Amino acid sequence: NLGCPSKKVQKNKFGACLIKEPDLVADCINSMVQNCKIPVTAKTRIGFDNIETFEYLNAFVKKISEAGCKTVILHARRAILKGLTPKENLKIPKLNYPMVYKIKDSNKDLEIILNGGITNTDQIIEHLNKCDGVMIGRAIYQNPYFLAEIEKRIFENTKIPTRSEIAEKLVEYVK
């Protein structure tokens, strides 16, 4: 995870501050790829502080892909490393979906998954036309049934249980 901008995380050299150190990130990914039997993925922001250029991000993505990372999740906001809280970093930096699309266009061999600000199924469908996938966080945290709505919209023939049916099943587990 190369996306968290919190001070505590930065102090320990984790999260979004690592976007500034592509060689170190590539070394870490290479080591994980060499020592793991599962795919190694990276989730990152599209930039940091005043750096939000296609050239920088594309070079970063290429460097980590050369190290063995074949799936990159891009949070479509830059990380402001000083002056904003992690919560503010989820809202104040503007979303830049076209940057993610451009990275996908330039890296056809990589799986590029878009993250950030996705709140409805229309957005998901739009993003899926330009990226390999989407990652949704807060919208599902706030409304877990959103997953059922997505399933119904994307896979139209799927039978989705109602909230009442889900609650009945949950009661069985609680017992």
Regions found by a protein language model. Give the residues of each.
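Alpha/beta enzyme core
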Residues: L2-F14, P22-E111
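Alpha/beta catalytic cores of nucleotide-metabolism and tRNA/nucleoside-modifying enzymes
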Residues: N35-P39, N50, F54-T71, P98-L114, ...
